[in-house]
Amino acid sequence: MKTTHRTRMPTTLEAFSPIIVMLLLLGLGYALFDLPAEPLMIISTVFAGFLVFKLGHCYLDILDAISEKIAKTMPALLILITVGLLIGTWISGGTIPMMIYYGLKAISPEYLYVTALFLTAIVSICTGTSWGSAGTVGVAFMGVAIGLDANLAATAGAVVAGAYFGDKLSPLSDTTNIASAAAGVDLYEHIAHLLYTTLPSFILSATVYVVYGLNYDFSNVATPEKVNTMIHELEQVYHFNFLLLIPVAIVLWGSITKKPTIPVMLLSAFIAIINAILIQKFSLSDVINSAVNGFDTSMIHHTSVSSDLSRLLNRGGMNSMMGTLLICFCALSFAGVLQLSGALTVIIQKLLTFVHSTLSLIITTILCGLTMIGVTCNGQISILIPGEMLKNAYVEKGLHPKNLSRTAEDSATIIEPILPWTAAGAYMAGTLGVATLSYLPWAILCWSGIIFAIIYGASGIGIAKLKK
């Protein structure tokens, strides 16, 4: 039965102790010893559970708190599953390959850096994966840069910036969905609000890349064979025509008109399935398998496919989201128990004693995000926990929670790839062949978002108020 006897609020030390334990476990276990984050989050939840018992609650209270927290974010979790389905069908239907194909054909030496920014951004928006776009199209651009004797650090920075621009704004991205869910904001409303900081950062990045590219002394070298091979293979595998863009148009229409996300994505996936069967001539079995388990180039029987193209196309499917869902369940369980204990209320009250303006609240959010990503090295947790902790603080200050979701992404999602010790930083450095600290100055979008967030916090521009 549920608690019927007296409970109490935690002291300040008790309130902060679960957060401290979580940071220590993730900082030591995940960052230093490469242990999986999920069991570390579960241990943190168990510790928070002991605190809850000490405060007078019972086991059923804990279960109810966890269930309630997960139930509130279930729509976003269902969107993540639908995103996996969408990516798999878009690849089998030829939508994503068509975008990549025409992007690769548009490469010009003087505009190499800005083209890398735009194309990786487009691919990342369409796929919702920064790692995927950097590991495929990004690698192709690094090959082009080597062939043209271009600045490799600048090229890598442009690739990373483009990849995370798309990841940040894509309705298919896990972090975008998690940020909106953590703050309790509609997905498309969150994406629209992100433009205040992300678009100026993108324009600044593009301007720097254009000016630098036009003033860089390029040798008159042809496009590297690696890129030509990828273009040729895409021509052999897919039949390209404007019908392949209908799934993208549907998602854009849904975003502009603010239609329910899941039905829009399912409609887009359905059209992509029709394209895959009627235009690309894949079997119904292969297309359904792409939707569930992800596309695999072994489904292509009429021509051979290189390992580079396989890396580009082998992705998607509902099952690809299971790892993300697992970490979400673990983090939400921790947040649910933390909320039951009253620790979040105590923490917020303590924070509000130092927060006297919109600017100080924005800076507090940024510091929380930077601390979480720097210590835990996990972008999803770094968005979820600050979102849960600070949501009520924004409401109490009369600020819309979408300011929180935007700032959480500015200080966590796009910061991760420019920190050498994070998984994203290590992946980008290893994949692109350029050290993290070398491409950091050129990944302008990744660090300038925080600057714009602080400017908006100080000026009040782009800060949404709660409607009374």
Swiss-Prot record:
Subcellular locations according to the entry: Cell membrane
Which InterPro entries does the protein's record reference?
Na/H_antiport_NhaC, Na/H_Antiport_NhaC-like_C, NhaC_Na-H+_Antiporter
Q: Which GO terms describe its molecular function?
A: sodium:proton antiporter activity
The protein's superkingdom reads Bacteria
Q: Which keywords does UniProt give here?
A: Antiport, Cell membrane, Ion transport, Membrane, Sodium, Sodium transport, Transmembrane, Transmembrane helix, Transport
Give me the Gene Ontology terms describing cellular component: plasma membrane
The UniProt entry lists the main location of this chain as membrane
What would be one Pfam family of this protein? Na_H_antiporter
Q: How does it sit in the membrane?
A: Multi-pass membrane protein
PANTHER family in UniProt: MALATE-2H(+)/NA(+)-LACTATE ANTIPORTER, MALATE-2H(+)_NA(+)-LACTATE ANTIPORTER
The Swiss-Prot or TrEMBL record describes its family as follows: Belongs to the NhaC Na(+)/H(+) (TC 2.A.35) antiporter family.
Alphabetical list of NCBIfam families matching this protein? antiport_nhaC (TIGR00931)
Q: What is this protein called?
A: Uncharacterized Na(+)/H(+) antiporter HI_1107
Species assigned in the record: Haemophilus influenzae (strain ATCC 51907 / DSM 11121 / KW20 / Rd)
